[in-house]
Amino acid sequence: MNKSQLAILVLTGASGAGKTTLTLKLNELEIPGVKGFNCDRVKIESDEMSASTDLQADILRYWISHLSQSETGIELAVLDTQISPHRALEVLNQEAINYAQIVLVDCDPAKRNERLHMDRSQPELANAQMDCWAAYLRGQADALGLSIIDTSNDSVEKSLVELELLVGDLLTRVRSS
């Protein structure tokens, strides 16, 4: 499969927003041709220290390259990342991905920080910097008119239905081309 035939749905959001949970639950649905990946679970070798936005772009490029070269049977990859929406758009355009969508998974700060403390045992990520990152991502998503899945008050199942609808719409566009 070449890049022009691969559909990419980038899920972005701050730590604790619910991206990984949604990606794992989506995989449990076993939708033919669709697979979710936690992109941060790959180590990118770099000769120089990159800024975090460059590292996230490198990670996104790695997954696009990996998925487009292998015979995986994947038509649509859902990539769980923390890349900024603007940077994700740049990378997707540079890589000539014809079918792409960026979706923000968002959550109010109190709930996100509660998840980081209680559910994930990562209290070090519940900080002002992560709150600012979440606000920045929300601002970009709003400015770019992106779909937003707000997990603040919705059950995982309801948020998963929202994601499944977005995946279905993108998959339909790919298959009808």
Locate the predicted segments by residue.
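Hydrophobic anchor at the beta1->P-loop junction of P-loop NTPases
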Residues: L11
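Small-molecule kinase domains that catalyze NTP-dependent phosphoryl transfer to phosphate-bearing small molecules
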Residues: Q122-E162
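Phosphate-binding P-loop
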Residues: M1-L6
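Walker A/P-loop
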Residues: T20
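Conserved phosphate-donor/acceptor-positioning beta-strand/loop module used by diverse small-molecule
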Residues: I97-H117
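Glycine-rich phosphate-binding loop used to anchor ATP phosphates in small-molecule kinases
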Residues: L55-Y99
